[in-house]
Amino acid sequence: MNVPAPLPPCSILLLAGGRGQRMGGRDKGLIEWQGAALIEHLHRLTRPLTDDLIISCNRNIDRYARYADRLVQDDDTDFNGPLAGIRAALPLARHRWLLILPCDVPLVDAALLRALREKASEYPERPIMVREGQHWQPLLGMIPVAHAATLEAAWQAGERSPRRALEPLQPVALQLEAGDPRLANLNTPCLLTGISENRNK
């Protein structure tokens, strides 16, 4: 019987610092789904995987603190997008890799996170990014913390897109089928309700 090789430790970043425009300005990570806040679903999944769990949040700091080892905030109040949270977390990560997840993907499972970490072990110098069909998902992946300075330089040059900021580093795809249900992005009230109804059938 083959025992899977142990995977190197990683820091984990949960992105919850957005404006929540599609949710009417509500703090998305704290919206309840299936009896718990979205951030709590991801906390349950990721807590056993790391001793360095980081949440990027820009409001409700006290509520998020219970779910993380550390919190990071953007350095201004303009809600500049997920790259702001990534650049804040990368220099602080305690491990070689930073695994990144947005707060609104509660159907992501342990098998997907393991696949990301296995791919990272194969390509230790390059970012790993989920690709669903032909579409990249730049907020689902892993970044070597050694690239913190590169992303910071992109930020200072005016780049705000995680995909474009990572492009020069030649991301490696973790290929998934189009429509993989684990990637359901519950970022509107209708999607939250629809997924809940489907799971309860």
Swiss-Prot record:
- Record localization: Cytoplasm
Please give the superkingdom of this protein's source.
Bacteria
Q: Which cofactor does the UniProt annotation name?
A: Mg(2+)
List GO molecular-function terms, semicolon-separated.
GTP binding; metal ion binding; molybdenum cofactor guanylyltransferase activity
**Keywords of the record:** Cytoplasm, GTP-binding, Magnesium, Metal-binding, Molybdenum cofactor biosynthesis, Nucleotide-binding, Transferase
Q: Which residues bind GTP?
A: L15, A16, G17, K28, D74, D104
Q: Which SUPFAM superfamilies match?
A: Nucleotide-diphospho-sugar transferases (SSF53448)
**A single GO BP annotation from the record?**
bis(molybdopterin guanine dinucleotide)molybdenum biosynthetic process
Task: Indicate the segments annotated as coiled coil, or none if absent.
Answer: none
- Residues reported to bind Mg(2+): D104
Reaction catalysed?
Mo-molybdopterin + GTP + H(+) = Mo-molybdopterin guanine dinucleotide + diphosphate
Q: What is its EC number?
A: 2.7.7.77
Q: Which InterPro entries match?
A: MobA-like_NTP_Trfase (IPR025877), Molybde_CF_guanTrfase (IPR013482), Nucleotide-diphossugar_trans (IPR029044)
- Write out the similarity annotation: Belongs to the MobA family.
The function of this protein is: Transfers a GMP moiety from GTP to Mo-molybdopterin (Mo-MPT) cofactor (Moco or molybdenum cofactor) to form Mo-molybdopterin guanine dinucleotide (Mo-MGD) cofactor.
Descriptive protein name: Molybdenum cofactor guanylyltransferase
- Organism of this sequence: Pseudomonas syringae pv. syringae (strain B728a)
